Amino acid sequence: MKQILLIDVSPRGKDSASRSVADTLAARLTSLYPSAKLIRRDLAAQPLPHLDEITLRALSTRDAAEAERLKETARQSDQLTDELLESDLLVIATPMWNFGIPSVLKAWIDLVVRPGRTFQYADGEVLGLAKDKKAILVLASGGVFTEGPWRPWDFIEPYLRQILNFIGIVDVQTVRIEGMNIPELVVDAVPKANKAVAELVL
């Protein structure tokens, strides 16, 4: 493994459960792969722009003259996409907000899920171009969404798995940090997740 890309999403800093467990995972990864380059991108500290008309044109135009004129606009997306494509492992550490992902993570996704770079259409089917990579999702939530009555409300893991599969990343493992807002569960939530990290196949 040559490069690991870790995406931190939570703005809670040291109080963030997803960041805490991501720290544990990062430590294990660097121990297993000491020569690997670890890129840790903090979307809370350095939020990315959401797509606007100019950015959409810059990323989708097929006109060479327009592409040249808008290349500076596309530069950040190019850098983020290169960062993903050059990585062997993608780690996304994020909280669940309102049953889905924070908008800063969606902004990153919108900048790296690009036709001709991370996916393409061939014979009426989608071909993911970010192949031969693995992903680990570290997902924190106030409630319990892997079982029980709230399970249908979990839109975060299905969405992330679907979008990763779309671009060719099909080997996806998940670590859940659940019950952060439930007094009887919060004490064990992070330790339980750290134990799950130790059991991941890396």
UniProtKB/Swiss-Prot annotation:
Keyword match Disulfide bond: no
One Pfam family cited in the UniProt record for this chain: Flavodoxin_2
Keyword Cell membrane belongs to the record: no
Binding-site residues for FMN, renumbered to this chain: 10, 16-18, 96-99
Record-listed E.C. numbers: 1.6.5.-, 1.7.1.17
Keywords from the UniProt entry: Flavoprotein, FMN, NAD, Oxidoreductase
Requisite cofactors: FMN
Broadest EC class assigned to this enzyme: oxidoreductase
Catalytic activity: 2 a quinone + NADH + H(+) = 2 a 1,4-benzosemiquinone + NAD(+); N,N-dimethyl-1,4-phenylenediamine + anthranilate + 2 NAD(+) = 2-(4-dimethylaminophenyl)diazenylbenzoate + 2 NADH + 2 H(+)
The organism's place on the tree of life at top rank: Bacteria
Subunit structure: Homodimer.
HAMAP family registered for this protein in UniProt: Azoreductase_type1
Function: Quinone reductase that provides resistance to thiol-specific stress caused by electrophilic quinones.
Family to which this protein belongs: Belongs to the azoreductase type 1 family.
Protein name in the entry: FMN-dependent NADH:quinone oxidoreductase
Organism: Beijerinckia indica subsp. indica (strain ATCC 9039 / DSM 1715 / NCIMB 8712)
Originating gene: azoR
